[in-house]
Amino acid sequence: MRTLLPFIRLFKFAKFPLILGLVLMILGLGSSMGLLTVSGWFLAATAIAGLGTLFNFFYPSASVRGLAIGRTVMRYFEKIVTHDATFRILSKLRVQVFEKIIPLSPAVLNRYRNSDLLNRLVSDVDTLDSLYLRLLAPFFTAVFVIIAMMIGLSFINIPLALGLGLFLLILLMIIPTVFYRLGQQFGERLIQARATYRTQFLEFIQAQAELLLFNAEDKLKEKMLVTEKTWQEDQAKEAKLSGFSTALVLFLNGLLISGMLWFASNADFGTDEYHTAYIALFTFAALAAFEIIMPLGAAFLHIGQVIAAAERVTEIIEQKPLVEFNGNEEFETKVRLISAKNLNFSYPEQETLVLKNLTLDLEQGKKIAILGKTGSGKSSLLQLLVRNYDANQGELLLAEKPISAYSEETLRHQICFLTQRVHVFSDTLRQNLQFASADKISDEQMIEMLHQVGLSKLLEQEGKGLNLWLGDGGRPLSGGEQRRLGLARILLNNASILLLDEPTEGLDRETERQILRLILQHAENKTLIIVTHRLSSIEQFDKICVIDNGRLIEEGDYNSLITKENGFFKRLIERV
């Protein structure tokens, strides 16, 4: 239950609507109980008066009409107010969750599937609406109304009022506790099964081509059927327990009515000529009282799911960023732009160092190629430069200041990074290119850039031009087209430092030369750092750094490295 406390604290953001909703709920339930109770007394008193006694029926009939209208009006406005307040709280919660997700580095987010993150942000947050609407508000309403009813009826007969009130308060403690325990067993399983099924279903839709190609469609369907069967079994258990709670409450209601009828028949109501009508009043009060208890069994059966959803949302909220941007230094261009001193780095939850005592100096405005075999640590160095991670040990300087001294905004403004995997948004071609810059990019610039990177045919597809819809993950595009789209974004960006991780991977030799020529031309007055294991046009770079097993083993220009006897770079060129 402690898991729910942070979400209960969110109620302060809609304090007045929630209190107003609670008051309206109390008035609505009180009107409903009063209507049935007064009606019972009114009918019995009218029957007694029908034997010849004078009876003023105007006051009780007006009370019945007033309570009936009050019940309808209160419940109408209670629904409006409580649901509006709940939506406000859920929107605030979604914003908070999203604000917690944004600072998380890719390393943290990669622990979760995209579909699972979406499920937590949408479905699990939606499940939490029951916390106020189905659990807290009805429970506190029931407590208040039972106490108010007990006080009101005590003016007529104290023993009967106390007996009825105490019986209902005992049930109010027992029924929610029992069904909370019963529902706790499968509440978490229901939430987990829902999340798993939605993830599998999304995979099934997104990977149709691959599933058909490798004849794996039936295998995934079988997994989905197993998940669906588990989910349905738990739903069936919940439905049975919900039915049992209703049957139990109805049974207890019958016992209470029978007991109240018995005790009221033997109670002393004084010598008033309508005193026997009070028997009906207490009997109908017992009947009406179970409107309070009836929804609580099924509601607290659901609390297991609410707690499980809260735990899943809390897990995201409590994630800590691997990197925190607390600096506020201004960027000033220096000749020695990037300096690494004795850098040691290993990825989280891994002991193996991918960078070992790496020392490196890179000058402003130079074109640098970083070579090395797969897994040598080339890409890891770029990850440190954009602060997706921080080094375990050592010093990394940007413009002669610690890289941690800059704010995230300053760092992102100065550095543009092309990763090995280009993300294509489910949006138009225009919007995918606009993501390259915070400033408005004209259609003419976009079209020219698409021509330069060899994506002219995209403008001709379906005759939509820049309005071409690229779909989820850019599935209509080939791997090479996705790389070129990523390059187009880089070339539309005005950052002074360009970091490119395998920019020509997946391109043929001729296209690779054209793209490298375009990149070098664009980076004429910029600092360019390219990570690659391909040697095309390598002689055009001002500096070449060779990294192996996390260490810098050679550096220099093309001519100095190619003439170095028994050098790693020279052997590499000769082998190619």
Swiss-Prot record:
Superkingdom field: Bacteria
GO molecular function, one term: ATP hydrolysis activity
Taxonomic classification: Bacteria, Pseudomonadati, Pseudomonadota, Gammaproteobacteria, Pasteurellales
Keywords on record: Amino-acid transport, ATP-binding, Cell inner membrane, Cell membrane, Membrane, Nucleotide-binding, Translocase, Transmembrane, Transmembrane helix, Transport
Native source organism of the sequence: Haemophilus influenzae (strain ATCC 51907 / DSM 11121 / KW20 / Rd)
UniProt catalytic activity: L-cysteine(in) + ATP + H2O = L-cysteine(out) + ADP + phosphate + H(+); glutathione(in) + ATP + H2O = glutathione(out) + ADP + phosphate + H(+)
Protein topology in the membrane: Multi-pass membrane protein
The protein's name in its UniProt record: Glutathione/L-cysteine transport system ATP-binding/permease protein CydC
Function: Part of the ABC transporter complex CydDC that exports the reduced low-molecular-weight thiols cysteine and glutathione to the periplasm. Export of these thiol-containing redox-active molecules may be crucial for redox homeostasis in the periplasm, permitting correct assembly of various respiratory complexes and formation of correct disulfide bonds in periplasmic and secreted proteins. CydC contains transmembrane domains (TMD), which form a pore in the inner membrane, and an ATP-binding domain (NBD), which is responsible for energy generation.
Family: Belongs to the ABC transporter superfamily. Cysteine exporter (TC 3.A.1.129.1) family.
Subunit description: Forms a heterodimer with CydD.
GO CC terms of this entry: plasma membrane
EC number of this enzyme: 7.4.2.-
NCBIfam families tied to this protein: CydC, PRK11160.1
Domain ABC transporter: 338-574
Note on domains (UniProt): In CydC the ATP-binding domain (NBD) and the transmembrane domain (TMD) are fused.
Enzyme class name: translocase
Annotated ABC transmembrane type-1 domain residues: 19-308
Residues holding ATP: G372, K373, T374, G375, S376, G377, K378, S379
GO biological process: cell redox homeostasis; cysteine export across plasma membrane; glutathione transmembrane transport
Signal peptide stretch: none
Record InterPro entries: AAA+_ATPase (IPR003593), ABC1_TM_dom (IPR011527), ABC1_TM_sf (IPR036640), ABC_CydC/D (IPR014223), ABC_transporter-like_ATP-bd (IPR003439), ABC_transporter-like_CS (IPR017871), P-loop_NTPase (IPR027417), Type_1_exporter (IPR039421)
Transmembrane segments: 16-36, 38-58, 133-153, 155-175, 244-264, 281-301
Compartment list: Cell inner membrane
SUPFAM superfamilies documented for this protein: ABC transporter transmembrane region, P-loop containing nucleoside triphosphate hydrolases
